[in-house]
């Protein structure tokens, strides 16, 4: 069962010239008394659900014109869902360019779901039986807890009942104390065309940016990579920190959303999770040789890893140098997007992925595309120099992709394609153009720094939380979330954690190495996606495809089923965390009173 609150907001706003009743919306964990002060008159905000600290209320404001714009006008007269003590509610992140000219974007997913709007940090509140939740947190069993879940986005609220909530990867030997989580919605409930979500703790990465950034790049490359965004998680009223909310590619929820836009065929194809050894190597007479491909339990007719035998046999028998033979194989396997994935695996030194490690991949056979196989990629935290254990150490950035087939011979799909002159030329074209416009210390660093500045207040909150579960705690500090942008850092608890490279340091070094090898002239200003006139936009000012905090943004309708109840809009005022919250408003100016 799901309830949704959605309010349509105006697409653009200038200063209001008349008095209006404005609805204020505030997320204030631990607050017991929330008020807004309008020209000195206090108006109380209230929370309708005692388990969700989401406070709303209306107040009359005057029509004095201001020298700046506010998103309080138009149809809604409502603020965005502000989070207490966060200076920016809705950001203005620079968007990445599209390096590939032909089929530049993956369109089968439809419009990007509003829940993955990267300019806003949603808040997730799960509430379940206290004794079961305590057991889940303290003892980390594989059990699931059923309860209610509220997802608060920029200008909407989704609430769900009968949600199955638990630890992702429970029972693994080296889990972090900050666990990863997952939840599944019940029945026909969906959010953004999905019913299953994964929250990754990002503890391997002090910046908490790498995995999200990797997915950002893959989307700019026109792939069907999982969608991601940062969220705040609260369980039974307690804050558990910041997490990367993303699709789990091993679940049909991801397939339904990214391949079919929420309208899947009556019967889906088989889906597989690639564990260590998922390499596409042919095993004649030994079907168990494909056992590293773990079938989804809901595969139609229980189809298992034996499904890979015809595919791997065909690849083994293909003359890689023959374009006709490659074209015939492409009727079975999508090489186009696979090459795009491999470009980014190479550029980021994704040692825990397919090419270098033959792991953390997956595959889906699409019945709506003549049963063609699609490669899936996942788990992007071990990238951009994190835990990179190679003989060359930092000199690894200069290792050419041309050396990868001999270094990593089990990556037979990538290695075979590079034996074909046309595929090798295409790979190199994608690689060099990506470095020229995107993967460099100009465009990509511009986005990294914008993301970091936006996330920083939440990272400070996250680093202040004492996790309650058993497991590894590297002890990364708030200061290291910034320091690891520029240089390597060591885990304060001296128990692992291999952030030897700074994130920006790695991007700059790798792009310079590529520019030297291929004689690439990198752009001098950040580049954005194509504008309506077909030319690339500059994002030197922080991006021009989204509006800044304090401005209005076009509203998007709810994509999930269930009744719509209401909605919210946005504001960028500063807040302060205390048990009693008092917001000061003079006319349309929302400021914090300390």
Swiss-Prot record:
The signal sequence is 1-19
- Where in or outside the cell is it found? Cell membrane
Region (Disordered) residue ranges read: 529-565
Q: How is it used?
A: Antibodies against CotH2 protects mice from mucormycosis, and thus could potentially be used to treat the disease.
Mention any one GO cellular component term assigned to this protein in its UniProt record: side of membrane
Biased region (Polar residues) positions are 534-547
Q: Where is the lipid attached (GPI-anchor amidated serine)?
A: 571
User: Which residues form the propeptide in this entry?
Assistant: 572-594
Write down the glycosylated positions.
77, 162, 226, 316, 441, 519, 533
Q: Which InterPro entries match?
A: Spore_coat_CotH_CotH2/3/7
Molecular functions (GO terms)? host cell surface receptor binding
Q: How does it sit in the membrane?
A: Lipid-anchor; GPI-anchor
Q: Which GO terms describe its biological process?
A: adhesion of symbiont to host endothelial cell; symbiont entry into host
Q: Which residues cross the membrane?
A: none
Its assembly, as annotated, is:
Interacts with host epithelial cell surface HSPA5/BiP protein.
- UniProt-recorded name of the protein: Invasin CotH2
Q: What is the lineage of its organism?
A: Eukaryota, Fungi, Fungi incertae sedis, Mucoromycota, Mucoromycotina
Give me the gene this protein comes from: CotH2
């Amino acid at each position: 069962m799901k309830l949704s609150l959605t309010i349509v907001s105006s697409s653009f706003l200038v200063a209001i010239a008349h008095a209006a009743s404005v609805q204020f919306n505030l997320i204030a964990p631990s607050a017991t008394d929330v008020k807004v002060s309008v020209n000195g008159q206090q108006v109380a905000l209230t929370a309708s659900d005692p388990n969700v600290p989401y406070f709303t209320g209306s107040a009359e404001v005057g029509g004095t014109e201001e020298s700046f714009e506010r998103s309080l006008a138009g149809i809604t007269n409502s603020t965005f869902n502000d989070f207490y003590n966060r200076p920016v509610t809705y950001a203005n992140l620079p968007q990445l360019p599209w390096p590939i000219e032909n089929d530049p974007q993956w369109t089968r997913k439809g419009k990007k779901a509003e829940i993955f709007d990267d300019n806003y940090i949603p808040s997730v509140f799960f509430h379940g039986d206290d004794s079961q939740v305590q057991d889940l947190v303290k003892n980390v069993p594989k059990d699931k807890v059923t309860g209610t879940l509220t997802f608060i986005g920029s200008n909407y609220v989704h609430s769900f009942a009968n949600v199955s909530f638990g630890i992702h990867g429970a029972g693994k030997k080296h889990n972090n104390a900050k666990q990863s989580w997952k939840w599944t919605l019940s029945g026909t409930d969906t959010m953004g065309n999905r019913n299953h979500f994964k929250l990754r703790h990002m503890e391997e990465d002090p910046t908490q940016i790498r995995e999200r950034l990797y997915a950002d790049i893959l989307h700019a490359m026109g792939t069907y990579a999982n969608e991601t965004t940062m969220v705040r998680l609260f369980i039974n009223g307690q804050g558990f920190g910041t997490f990367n909310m993303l699709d789990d590619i091993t679940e049909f929820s991801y397939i339904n959303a990214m391949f079919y836009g929420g309208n899947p065929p009556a019967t889906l194809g088989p889906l597989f999770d690639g564990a260590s050894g998922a390499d596409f190597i042919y095993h004649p007479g030994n079907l168990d040789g494909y056992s590293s491909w773990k079938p989804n339990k809901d595969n139609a007719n229980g189809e298992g890893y034996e499904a890979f035998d015809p595919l791997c046999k065909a690849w083994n028998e293909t003359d890689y140098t023959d374009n006709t033979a490659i074209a015939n194989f492409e009727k079975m396997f999508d090489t186009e997007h696979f090459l795009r994935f491999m470009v980014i695996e190479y550029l980021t030194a994704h040692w825990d992925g397919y090419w270098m490690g033959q792991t953390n991949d997956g595959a889906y056979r699409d019945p709506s595309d003549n049963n063609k196989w699609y490669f899936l990629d996942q788990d992007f935290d071990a990238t951009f120099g994190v835990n990179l254990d190679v003989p060359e150490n930092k000199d690894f950035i200069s290792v050419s992709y041309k050396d990868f087939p001999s270094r990593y011979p089990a990556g037979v799909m990538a290695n075979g394609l590079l034996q074909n002159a046309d595929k090798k030329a295409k790979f190199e074209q994608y690689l060099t153009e990506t470095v020229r416009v995107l993967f460099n210390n100009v465009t990509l660093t511009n986005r990294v720094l914008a993301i970091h500045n936006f996330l920083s207040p939440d990272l400070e909150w996250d680093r202040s939380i004492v996790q309650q579960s058993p497991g590894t705690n590297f002890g990364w500090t708030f200061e290291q979330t910034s320091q690891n942008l520029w240089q390597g850092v060591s885990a304060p608890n001296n128990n692992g954690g291999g952030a030897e490279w700074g994130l920006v340091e790695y991007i700059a070094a790798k792009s310079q190495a590529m520019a030297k090898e291929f004689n690439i002239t990198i752009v001098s200003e950040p580049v954005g996606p194509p504008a309506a006139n077909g030319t690339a936009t500059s994002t030197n000012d922080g991006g021009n495809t989204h509006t800044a905090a304090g401005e209005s943004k076009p509203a998007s309708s709810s994509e999930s089923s269930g009744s719509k109840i209401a909605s919210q809009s946005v504001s960028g005022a500063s807040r302060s965390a205390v048990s009693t919250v008092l917001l000061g408003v003079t006319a349309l100016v929302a400021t914090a009173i300390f």
